[in-house]
A protein has these predicted regions:
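Nucleotide-activated chemistry modules centered on ATP-dependent adenylation/adenylyltransferase
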Residues: 2-349
């Protein structure tokens, strides 16, 4: 939201004038993670909307009728689903009526670099359980919307970024939004505010990234004891993140003295500084995955927080000048001509 709001404030394009933050209110505890942000946005941000969903109840009903799932699955503390039935598509279709009512033509989601994966198992190509968060899904949905005549395109402006670079940009550029972040598998209410549990894998990840970036996890509602516990369990249990991201984060935490690892491999294996750069990858984050007139101002902002920009050439990352690369002006294939052929730099000054 912070990036989109900033971009819309600078744009002279008719297609980038308003941002409509729309929250999907699940009927269960998943809603807790968004509640702090929703209350703030409802009271302070124009165009905020909310759609109520009961999809989580439906998924639970499915699980209760699967004979191979233990009956007490809801009481098992785990960072994993018994079977993943949840899908991003539920939220996307949930907001479509509001998009139609308000005349919104872009459905922007927050998927990052490591959610586009193509893998193979015994000759079977798959998406590592992340298809609904991948660029391929964005494109499939955009094609579907176009075939329906709905004039809606779907994309993410975060695909060139790692989780830690997103957190770095959030904490440095939008600290007021960082205060609203609750990324936790078991968030709970304390008086009028939702707080993270400080025990799950997501909490380890958030505490680790903020600590490595010299930011205060307490800003997101963590207590001192939760921070200490999360960092201790970061070493003991690890996190779920792309391998290079885990390596770089562990390196940064070790270097700043936040953790002590007993794994000698961390002393001999080099870090992965590319994690802190904008990464242009032909499969995961090509230039044309973002509409043309957003690229120039978006990259200008992100370069203020990233360690430069890199482009994948074969198996290596090579420095790239984002604005002079021939592919920078590649057309975005899922929008009609709204008069967006104006040069992005001219649109934003």
């Amino acid at each position: 939201f912070g990036l989109l709001s900033e971009l819309s404030g600078k744009s002279t394009s008719k297609s980038v004038r308003e941002v409509h933050p729309i929250f999907c209110n699940e009927s269960g505890r998943h809603w807790f993670t968004a509640l702090n942000a929703y209350r703030h946005f409802r009271d302070h941000v124009p165009n905020t909307g909310r759609v109520w969903l009961n999809s989580d109840r439906m998924f639970t009903w499915f699980l209760r009728h699967m004979p191979f799932i233990r009956k007490d699955f809801a009481d098992v503390r785990s960072d994993e689903y018994p079977i993943r039935l949840w899908t991003v598509a539920v939220f996307l279709f949930g907001v479509l009526p509001l998009l139609k009512k308000r005349g919104v033509g872009r459905l922007v989601i927050g998927d990052e670099f490591d959610t586009t994966v193509k893998a193979s198992f015994k000759g079977i190509v798959h998406f590592d359980g992340l298809y609904d968060q991948s660029r391929f899904f964005d494109e499939a949905m955009s094609r579907f919307f176009m075939q329906k005549g709905w004039m809606v395109s779907q994309f993410s402006i975060l695909r060139p970024l790692s989780e830690i670079l997103i957190e770095k940009t959030l904490s440095q550029r939008y600290p007021e939004l960082l205060k609203l972040q609750v990324s936790c598998h078991a968030a709970h209410k304390e008086e009028d505010r939702v707080r993270p549990c400080g025990r799950c894998e997501k909490c380890r990840r958030i505490v680790g990234m903020l600590t490595a970036l010299d930011q205060c996890p307490q800003t997101c509602g963590y207590s001192n004891s939760q921070v200490a516990k999360s960092l201790r369990e970061f070493v003991e249990k690890g996190i779920h993140q792309e391998a290079e991201g885990q390596r770089q984060l562990t390196y940064m935490l070790t270097k700043c003295g936040a953790i002590n690892t007993v794994d000698d491999s961390f002393q001999t294996t080099p870090p992965h500084p590319e994690i802190l750069s904008i990464r242009i990858d032909p499969q995961r984050s090509p230039f044309h995955s973002v509409p043309m007139e957003l690229r120039y101002p978006l990259f200008k902002i992100l370069l203020q927080h990233a360690d430069g920009a890199l482009q994948r050439k074969g198996s290596r990352w090579k420095p790239v000048n984002l604005f002079t690369d021939p592919l920078f002006e590649a057309s975005y294939p899922f929008e009609l001509d709204y008069g967006l052929r104006e040069n992005g730099q001219a649109l934003f000054g």
